[in-house]
UniProtKB/Swiss-Prot annotation:
HAMAP family: FabZ. NCBIfam families: fabZ (TIGR01750), PRK00006.1 (NF000582). It is found in: Cytoplasm. Involved in unsaturated fatty acids biosynthesis. Catalyzes the dehydration of short chain beta-hydroxyacyl-ACPs and long chain saturated and unsaturated beta-hydroxyacyl-ACPs. This is 3-hydroxyacyl-[acyl-carrier-protein] dehydratase FabZ. The active site is at residue 47. One of its GO terms (biological process) is fatty acid biosynthetic process.
Length: 145
């Protein structure tokens, strides 16, 4: 899935769109996506100017965005202006290595279960096959007025 397809599914835009490409997707099971991290990311101006590090919460957000793409694929729906995909919870978040400019962040997200509109996922982020971050995520899709 390229960026044009991603933009049709996710409401996120610059500077918070954190999925550049979907490499693999198994509907109802898992997704593998990537984010190319560049020095042009706006968060590097303040985190940290002399030693730029991608904030851990943005790695979590990147996994949540990949999870949203998997959810839409699993349900066979596309979002509209009245559909919102909310991040509902996080458990067991661990950060194992810093991520910086020039890194390619690979997000692997697995759907653990889906019940009553609530999705639970296990996600990991890697750079060069090295674990950078891991967490369990909960998300929900809602219709808004």
């Amino acid at each position: 899935m390229d960026i044009h397809q991603i933009l049709k599914l996710l409401p996120h835009r610059y500077p918070i769109l954190l999925v550049d490409r979907v490499l693999e997707i198994e509907t109802g099971k898992r997704i593998k996506a990537l984010k190319n991290v560049t020095i042009n990311e706006p968060f590097f101006m303040g985190h940290f100017p002399k030693h730029p590090v991608m904030p851990g919460v943005l790695m979590i957000e990147a996994m949540a965005q990949a999870a949203a793409l998997l959810s839409f694929s699993t349900l066979g729906v596309t979002p509209d202006d009245k559909t919102v995909y909310y991040f509902a919870g996080i458990d067991g978040a661990r950060f194992k290595r810093p991520v910086g400019p020039g890194d390619q962040l690979i997000m692997d997200v697995e759907l653990l279960r889906m019940k009553a509109g609530i999705f639970k996922f296990k996600g990991v982020c890697r750079v060069d096959e090295n674990l950078a971050c891991e967490a369990e995520l909960m998300c929900t899709m809602r219709t808004v007025a």
